[in-house]
Amino acid sequence: MSAPAAGATAGGDDAADRNVEMWKIKRLIKSLELARGNGTSMISLIIPPKDQVARIQRMLAEEYGTASNIKSRVNRLSVLGAITSVQGRLKLYNKVPPNGLVVYCGTIMTDEGKEKKVNIDFEPFKAINTSLYLCDNKFHTEALQGLLADDNKFGFIIMDGNGCLFGTLQGNTREVLHKFTVDLPKKHGRGGQSAVRFARLRNEKRHNYVRKVAENSVEQFIKNDKVTVAGLILAGSADFKTELGQSDMFDQRLQAKMIKTVDIAYGGENGFNQAIELAADTLASVKFIQEKKLIGGYFDEISQDTGKYVFGVKDTLAALEMGAIETLICWENLDIVRYKMKNSLGEDILLNLRPDEEKDKSHFTDSETGQDMEIIETMPLLEWFANNYKNFGAALEIVTDKSQEGAQFVRGFGGIGGLLRYRVDLAHVDLEDELDNIDLDDYSRAAVVSHWAPYSFLLLFKLVSSFFFINLFINYPALSNYNISLSQSSSSLIAISHTTLYSKFLFHFIEFAPRVPHYCRFVWSVDAFSSAGKASHVCQHTEKETFHARNEDAIGGLFNRTKVEARATHSHSMTSTLSLPSVDVSTRNSNDF
């Protein structure tokens, strides 16, 4: 069981690092709360700043003597072992760290019913002013919960003609405290002599509505004669919010906490969300607003197709290893596990699997030998990111799904992505990896001949028909008013493109495109082993000139384009040279074939 790294700055200068430390604390609390042991062998020790390590050591020595009198032998040995472990941990510290020290030691029971020793010590990322020593059958984490809460909580009062809502915003948590509805009379021009009476009744009900809101605000935001929020924001349509803020019925303590009044177009929870957005400049320090802004910027990059974004486990890890990711965005409950394994050759294999993929045993089997690979290490991918993101020069942002943008990021992009420093063509990276994995023995002469033998007749037919039509147009020029010619000394080009292990052999015999009606073109292409939907379009040039092959890779409806430079050499074996005037042969696109 891992613990948060010690030595985090007390002030939390780097907000991203602070959020990572908060996630580590949250994950630690969750795992410690589930741990259970036999007897009272689990020790929870919290030492506040400026306390003395020597004093704690003396206290533990006294506890050791007391625990020696426990009658149960098993429980006595467990407690003594836990106290000894705590004493050993304290020997690592000459003094209490600036933010205090947290120690958890003991023997817990695993899901398989086996005993497991747990020893955790760390300095929290901000000061913890609590002193605690408990020996129980569970770890006590109540004091750590205060580390997760932001210092500032803001209150919201949403008023309109249909009702009122009271809510709070703290960190990335939005909470609705109370809401009620009202039925207020509307303005109208009827009434005759009773019009004044109707107006008086309407104003009376509005007054009673404002008074009810003022009374409820005291119940929701004042506890034990103290205001429970750092600031109060009034939001609503019409003049209700203004009347409330200026009314004598509104508690003076709450009036002093008013920081902003905003106009909204909705009531209820929709109005609550709109009020949070409109008050974003005031609430800039709240994590909820920061999270919405971060993911909103990520969506803007995608909508504008800037290419400076990445999503998905494979592409995100590839960009991270290249050092291209500036901000790594991950969902706090990302359920991907990182496996490090060894195959029969002693090579390290890394896999990142989701829970449904872990059920497939083929991921843990060596494809060459059929034997199970040795699992060296398993770790949640998010924990690996938290421990290593600085090594790649990236900032890690851990987000929730409590905001609308966060929920969309989790559902639509799997909860993992990143903002890039510059554009990265990940399709080109994948292509290079695939080319490195190609075994040329699979394309031996015998294999190629045996595969292409059935197509030999078709090849012969295409070549013969090509020369037939050429001679036809040369001998009978009246058939066309257009000139017929070939490109200089390089009339045919063979392009063999290896794109995957089940590669494509794409033979393009681009033969004499005469500009006659309907453009008679004699092109033969064979697409074999098509598994990745890739094709290479070759632009023909003169001998020993550079050509560019444009790779179009259709994955998930997106096209990633990669330019690959190669050298074209003159092919004499499959080319016929004719002394005809030369014109350009236009490059075909995918629709031509």
Swiss-Prot record:
Signal peptide: none
Gene3D superfamilies (alphabetical): 3.30.1330.30, eRF1 domain 1 (3.30.960.10), eRF1 domain 2 (3.30.420.60)
SMART domains recorded: eRF1_1
InterPro entries per UniProt: eFR1_2_sf, eRF1_1_Pelota, eRF1_1_sf, eRF1_2, eRF1_3, Peptide_chain-rel_eRF1/aRF1, Ribosomal_eL30-like_sf
SUPFAM superfamilies: L30e-like (SSF55315), N-terminal domain of eukaryotic peptide chain release factor subunit 1, ERF1 (SSF55481), Translational machinery components (SSF53137)
Subcellular location(s) of the protein: Cytoplasm
Main localization, broad class: cytoplasm
One GO BP: cytoplasmic translational termination
Domain of life, source organism: Eukaryota
GO CC terms in record: cytosol; translation release factor complex
Record's keyword terms, sorted: Cytoplasm, Protein biosynthesis
GO molecular function, one term: sequence-specific mRNA binding
Pfam families recorded: eRF1_1, eRF1_2, eRF1_3
Free-text function comment from the UniProt entry: Directs the termination of nascent peptide synthesis (translation) in response to the termination codons UAA, UAG and UGA.
PANTHER family found in the cross-reference section: PEPTIDE CHAIN RELEASE FACTOR SUBUNIT 1 (PTHR10113)
Quaternary organization: Heterodimer of two subunits, one of which binds GTP.
Family the UniProt entry places it in: Belongs to the eukaryotic release factor 1 family.
Protein's name in the database: Eukaryotic peptide chain release factor subunit 1
This protein's encoding gene: erfa-1
